Amino acid sequence: MKPFPRAEISSSALQNNLAVLRQQASSSQVMAVVKANGYGHGLLNVAKCLNNADGFGLARLEEALELRAGSVKARLLLLEGFFRSTDLPLLVEHDIDTVVHHESQIEMLEQATLSKPVTVWLKVDSGMHRLGVTPEQFSAVYARLTACKNVAKPIHLMTHFACADEPDNHYTQVQMQTFNQLTADLPGFRTLANSAGALYWPKSQGDWIRPGIAMYGVSPVTGDCGANHGLIPAMNLVSRLIAVREHKANQPVGYGCYWTAKQDTRLGVVAIGYGDGYPRNAPEGTPVWINGRRVPIVGRVSMDMLTVDLGHDATDQVGDDVLLWGQALPVEEVAEHIGTIAYELVTKLTPRVAVCLA
């Protein structure tokens, strides 16, 4: 018996998306970003489905250790770097690369006693101003890392874009120019491109691309859809109808009597709510997909349920599947209705939602 609600993860969609991104950046290796539990798709599930990716990017050491425990052998990179000196022996033991972006990390590397050097990707702040060494600091930091016995050579180089998801924004060109001028003629790999860089800024692709949301079939650009690039949504978020009710005109439904029917209709109650990670602020009209058509949410989303207007002549039955987002209803469209981004929707599902390989 299938659980509900459930997030059905398509291995064939993940493989398709990897192939599309390889074609987009044919001279680059692909570091699939699987942080935040594989963007809500299941960390180990995604890594196993993408076993032909060249590497995986993660936010936390614990995520990397989970992949190694699951027999994932590919290159792993901690995108925020290590946080404590006690992390360093684990990086060595499990062959995990680390970003270095702050002087405190350099000090820990210099003071550590390790059995072998750690592979480092030095992050340059080319204009996002969140993490990374500034252009003014770069030469001194690079020299310091080069002199450190605990840093493997060559040192690899990276940056991160602030506005690559705005294809007409010139700032990405400025960041590329800053990074390229600083790192010219230095050895090692270079990685600049996230999903938006890989899809929209081909000159940013470098030795490695780091696609995150695009790997899951979702466009990083507001108003765009992954299908426009040949990507396929990897997640179908599915629940079911647990009640179908006759509803009279002028009757309200749900907490606060937030919505009132203008005419006689049939309402469906769906077993999913904000306790599962579906946003409480989803407004009236946010679509779900039932039996081949879009129907609107009405009333407030509650902890365990939401209500939809099936229409006066609806023939939907208790037990029918309901797609909250997925291949028939792009998560980008749902996010636009709710006033958020697809990243937030897929990563905020709670443990009550079963994540299943389809």
From Swiss-Prot:
Reactions catalysed according to its record: L-alanine = D-alanine
Single GO molecular-function term? alanine racemase activity
Q: Could you tell me which pathway this protein works in?
A: Amino-acid biosynthesis; D-alanine biosynthesis; D-alanine from L-alanine: step 1/1
Name of the molecule in the record: Alanine racemase
Q: Which InterPro entries does the annotation name?
A: Ala_racemase (IPR000821), Ala_racemase/Decarboxylase_C (IPR009006), Ala_racemase_C (IPR011079), Ala_racemase_N (IPR001608), Ala_racemase_pyridoxalP-BS (IPR020622), PLP-binding_barrel (IPR029066)
Q: Which NCBIfam families match?
A: alr
Chain positions recorded as substrate binding sites: R130, M303
Recorded name of the encoding gene: alr
EC class of the enzyme, as a word:
isomerase
Q: Please list the residues that make up the active site.
A: K35 (proton acceptor), Y255 (proton acceptor)
| HAMAP family recorded | Ala_racemase (MF_01201)
Q: Which residues carry this modification: N6-(pyridoxal phosphate)lysine?
A: K35
Obligatory cofactor(s): pyridoxal 5'-phosphate
Where is it found, in Gene Ontology cellular component terms? cytosol
Family membership = Belongs to the alanine racemase family.
Q: Which BP terms in the Gene Ontology apply to this protein?
A: D-alanine biosynthetic process
Q: Which keywords annotate this record?
A: Isomerase, Pyridoxal phosphate
Q: Its biological function?
A: Catalyzes the interconversion of L-alanine and D-alanine. May also act on other amino acids.
EC number, UniProt record: 5.1.1.1
